[in-house]
């Protein structure tokens, strides 16, 4: 069976809602939820969702032998990371002092307790949970048809800090600006949940299933060259 889109299953994440949302925007595509490295390698596109703790995520990825399959997919085909699937693409997470996949340069930091208050001094809760505006930091095909400042749904206590500003494709505020979307080569990854973000999320997923990364050159070469 030819697989158009593989949704990576490493035992963590709301995989059914992700796969159903993709099937909704791509009804003729073959969408498979899989933990098979071979299926991931054969798929035309890969979606890498996830939720939970970074240490648990990395343990499950390695237990299933998925590390190399994920890295290869990120370097060779359209690849969408979602929530924890975005965070572990980076080098290190403060959560459990966890070494991550190291596909993208940067780290993952917890929202600092001392900064979590609004302009009137009211305490803000962690995790950051609910709808928030997303500002497009750079043009990208996955933003097509989505207004700058559109609202998406978030659930997270940690956020990524890329060491290369050119990676930043979108940001939000809680209560300070933080990166919520990155783009590099074949990779687009988001902190929010497009599958829970109604029309805006479905638009982004629809853009992903038709995206040809070769038509959108990235400033960062994943083969190992430095980012310009």
Swiss-Prot record:
Give the matching SUPFAM superfamilies: Class I glutamine amidotransferase-like
Provide the protein's localization: Cytoplasm
Stored Pfam families: GATase (PF00117)
Has keyword Lipid metabolism?
Answer: no
Q: Residues in domain Glutamine amidotransferase type-1? A: 4-218
GO biological process per UniProt? L-histidine biosynthetic process
Q: Which GO terms describe its molecular function?
A: glutaminase activity; imidazoleglycerol-phosphate synthase activity; lyase activity
Recorded metabolic or biological pathway in which this protein acts: Amino-acid biosynthesis; L-histidine biosynthesis; L-histidine from 5-phospho-alpha-D-ribose 1-diphosphate: step 5/9
Per the UniProt record, which EC number(s) apply here? 4.3.2.10, 3.5.1.2
Tell me the keywords, alphabetical order: Amino-acid biosynthesis, Cytoplasm, Glutamine amidotransferase, Histidine biosynthesis, Hydrolase, Lyase
* Entry superkingdom: Bacteria
Listed InterPro entries: Class_I_gatase-like (IPR029062), GATASE (IPR017926), Imidazole-glycPsynth_HisH (IPR010139)
Q: What is one cellular component GO term in this UniProt entry?
A: cytoplasm
Catalyses: 5-[(5-phospho-1-deoxy-D-ribulos-1-ylimino)methylamino]-1-(5-phospho-beta-D-ribosyl)imidazole-4-carboxamide + L-glutamine = D-erythro-1-(imidazol-4-yl)glycerol 3-phosphate + 5-amino-1-(5-phospho-beta-D-ribosyl)imidazole-4-carboxamide + L-glutamate + H(+); L-glutamine + H2O = L-glutamate + NH4(+)
**Sorted alphabetically, which CDD domains does this protein's record hold?**
GATase1_IGP_Synthase
Active-site residues per Swiss-Prot or TrEMBL entry: 83, 193, 195
Share what the entry says about its subunit structure, partners included.
Heterodimer of HisH and HisF.
**General function of this protein:** IGPS catalyzes the conversion of PRFAR and glutamine to IGP, AICAR and glutamate. The HisH subunit catalyzes the hydrolysis of glutamine to glutamate and ammonia as part of the synthesis of IGP and AICAR. The resulting ammonia molecule is channeled to the active site of HisF.
> Would you tell me the protein name for this molecule?
Imidazole glycerol phosphate synthase subunit HisH
Q: What is the lineage of its organism?
A: Bacteria, Pseudomonadati, Pseudomonadota, Betaproteobacteria, Nitrosomonadales
């Amino acid at each position: 069976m030819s697989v158009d889109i593989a949704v990576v299953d490493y035992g963590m994440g709301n995989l059914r809602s992700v796969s159903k949302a993709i099937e909704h925007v791509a009804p003729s595509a073959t969408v498979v939820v899989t933990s098979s490295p071979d299926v991931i390698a054969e798929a035309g596109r890969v979606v890498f969702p996830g939720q939970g703790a970074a240490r648990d995520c990395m343990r499950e990825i390695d237990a299933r032998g998925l590390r190399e399959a994920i890295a290869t997919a990120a370097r060779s085909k359209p690849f969408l990371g979602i929530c924890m699937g975005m965070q572990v693409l980076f080098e290190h997470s403060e959560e459990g002092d966890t070494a991550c996949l190291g596909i993208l340069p940067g780290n993952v930091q917890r929202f600092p307790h001392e900064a979590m208050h609004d302009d009137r001094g009211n305490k803000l809760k962690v995790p950051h949970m609910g709808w928030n505006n997303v500002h497009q930091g750079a043009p990208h095909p996955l933003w097509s048809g989505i207004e700058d400042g559109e609202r998406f749904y978030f659930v997270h206590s940690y956020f990524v800090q890329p060491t290369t500003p050119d990676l930043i494709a979108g940001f939000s505020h809680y209560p300070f600006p933080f990166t919520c979307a990155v783009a590099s080569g074949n990779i687009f990854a988001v902190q929010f949940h497009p599958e829970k973000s109604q029309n805006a999320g479905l638009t982004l997923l629809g853009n992903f299933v038709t995206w040809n990364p070769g038509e959108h050159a990235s400033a960062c070469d994943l083969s190992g060259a430095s980012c310009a």
